[in-house]
């Protein structure tokens, strides 16, 4: 197994891993969503009068629909379908009436799920953390032998395509160089086991299969992946034991030893 993966596993199993990780991924619930008071009053009115069409027409335009239902997304993307599918409209509205008006009003202003906020957190942590290498914008990065690039996912992707023949059409999370040697990487915070999280793992691993030239690859991963005897640990880490997969918490140590 890769040295840095071993260090990450030890850190996760013996140290205050989660307390330290919170500095990288501070998953603090967002503020409640704001909805215009006039819209709230209309929702109350149509809920009480059980005006299915008007109530649904308002709710479907909000960021967050009050209930989970497989047919809602279709209605969101096809406004005409509302008039042609009265049975589904009635069924969904009956489900909404069952949760009560008070619950409905709470549901539509719920904060964004923290797992939807995770994306930018790693880069924010990079910006505010001191590393052994200087942090440079994309222009200054080319002028120096050493540095960590501060740029958007798309800027990093385009840079990697131009300089390393990087082929995937998705953004990158990390680019650095030391004494002229380049590193590119993906980051993931795997919060649980399951299909989506497995896909996230594979998404990060794909950086090693990107076909990029003249650079080395890293996958900066955190979360349940380091739980020994866990599903991800057994089926993925063992299969990818030769890759540089490690926690964000050991990134600076890795960069210090990178040659």
Question: Which residue ranges define each predicted feature?
Answer:
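Catalytic cores of nucleic-acid endonucleases
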Residues: 13, 28-29, 188-232
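Nuclease-adjacent, charged terminal/linker segments that flank catalytic cores
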Residues: 1-118
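Secondary-structure boundary elements
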Residues: 125-134, 178-181, 214
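Internal, hydrophobic cores of structured domains that mediate oligomerization or house catalytic pockets
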Residues: 115-123, 127
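Active-site beta-strand-loop-beta-strand hairpin of nuclease catalytic cores
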Residues: 167-184
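Domain-level recognition of nuclease-like catalytic cores that cleave nucleotide substrates
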Residues: 219-259
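A short acidic/basic microdomain associated with nuclease active sites
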Residues: 108, 112, 128-166
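Short, well-structured alpha-helical interface segments that form or flank functional binding sites
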Residues: 113, 117, 167-170, 195-206
